[in-house]
A protein has these predicted regions:
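Conserved cofactor-binding/catalytic machinery of classical short-chain dehydrogenase/reductase
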Residues: 27, 73, 139, 150, ...
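C-terminal helical subdomain
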Residues: 153, 237, 257-265, 269-307
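The beta1-alpha1 cofactor-binding region of Rossmann-like NAD(H)/NADP(H)-dependent oxidoreductases
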Residues: 45-46, 68-82, 137, 148-151
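Catalytic loop of short-chain dehydrogenase/reductase
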Residues: 100, 106-144, 163-248, 259, ...
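Canonical Rossmann dinucleotide-binding motif of NAD(H)/NADP(H)-dependent dehydrogenases/reductases
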Residues: 2-42
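Hydrophobic positions on the long internal alpha-helix
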Residues: 95, 154-158, 162, 239-243, ...
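N-terminal Rossmann-like NAD(P) cofactor-binding module of classical short-chain dehydrogenase/reductase
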Residues: 15-16, 39, 92-95, 172
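Hydrophobic/aromatic anchor residues within beta-strands of the central parallel beta-sheet
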Residues: 64-66, 255
Length: 307
């Protein structure tokens, strides 16, 4: 992709998942404007290639390339890793942005409720939306396989290339306000996920299996799981936990997670209140952290916050 070995070493390269629209596309645009070569990925090849063409054309940004990626498909993830290895020889920035809501929604019914943003953010909308948002078992499986296992799949495949970064690797996991432990009704689950010294992927994945079993048996509320966007909320809570495990395991990298803000995007059925440009600021800041920047932290937009 580039001429000399020296050029390769100096060039910063980023991979962004789920980047054909919304926050992901805006993160790609902003990083490219900072001189980073961006590998924009998307599950849909036509939409992803179209997003790259729009950046190159109307935005006059040449340093963006497309590669197809389905975070739920091992072979697709492997193909991306091989592409980055052969084209760039290393990776400096990984932004795990691909996500799924895990919910079946009656969009018109949701619109008719006219729920204000404050009700969404505070959790007061939980009881209002139960009739229009439906959590299915299959939806939860897809949600976990995308938001947690998909992130893990991509990260593990790209870690060898991130370890070769000459500028210091950055991993940014795009999370959600719904991830915050204070929103988890179960005290025992909160305590388990707060015990950072003993937190492991095995424990995290055990929690996901428990959730699925409780969902199947119809006892989510009784066992203390969140009832607002249940699988989505839990997937982002464990994504934060995985971020802390990664940061501890790879001290030479800066690994953080971030709630981008209540952005108006497809994943929240366009109920958000801030623009994608605003929402991308936190992830971009973390992707470009200086060498002495924080790691193993959670950010609410650009401000460090409590898990």
């Amino acid at each position: 992709m580039v001429g000399s070995n020296e050029q390769r070493e100096m060039q910063r390269v980023a991979v962004i998942t789920g980047a054909n629209k919304g926050i992901g596309l805006e993160i790609a645009r902003q990083l490219a404007l900072h001189g980073v070569t961006v590998v924009l990925t998307a599950r849909d090849e036509k939409r992803g290639a179209g997003a790259v063409e729009s950046l190159r054309g109307s935005h006059q940004i040449p340093n963006v390339v497309f590669h197809q990626l389905d975070v739920r498909d091992e072979s697709s993830v492997g193909a991306l890793a091989e592409f980055v290895r052969t084209q760039f020889g290393k990776l400096d920035i990984l932004v795990n942005n691909a996500g799924a809501s895990g919910i079946s929604v009656d969009v018109e019914g949701l619109k008719s409720l006219g729920i204000d943003p404050e009700a969404w953010l505070s959790g007061k909308a939980t009881s209002l939306v139960q009739g229009v948002l439906r959590q299915t078992y299959d939806g939860a499986v897809t949600c976990f396989d995308t938001n947690y296992y998909g992130c893990k799949r991509v990260t593990e495949a790209l870690l060898p290339l991130l370890e070769l970064s000459t500028s210091g690797a950055r991993i940014v996991n795009v999370s959600s306000l719904r991830s915050e432990l204070r929103r988890m009704p179960s005290e025992s689950i909160r305590e388990e996920l707060s015990d950072i010294d003993n937190l492991t992927e095995e424990k995290i994945e055990g929690l996901l299996r428990r959730f699925l079993e409780d969902l199947k048996e119809g006892r989510l509320e009784a066992t203390g799981w969140p009832m607002m966007l249940p699988s989505y909320s839990v997937s982002k809570t464990v994504l934060n936990a995985y971020t802390r495990v990664l940061a501890r395991r790879h001290p030479s990298m800066l690994v953080n997670c971030v709630h981008p803000g209540y952005v108006k995007t497809d994943i929240n059925w366009n109920t958000g209140v801030i623009t994608t440009e605003e929402g991308a600021k936190g992830p971009v800041m973390l992707a470009l952290l200086p060498a002495d920047g924080p790691t193993g932290c959670y950010f609410d937009q650009t401000t460090k916050a409590e898990f």
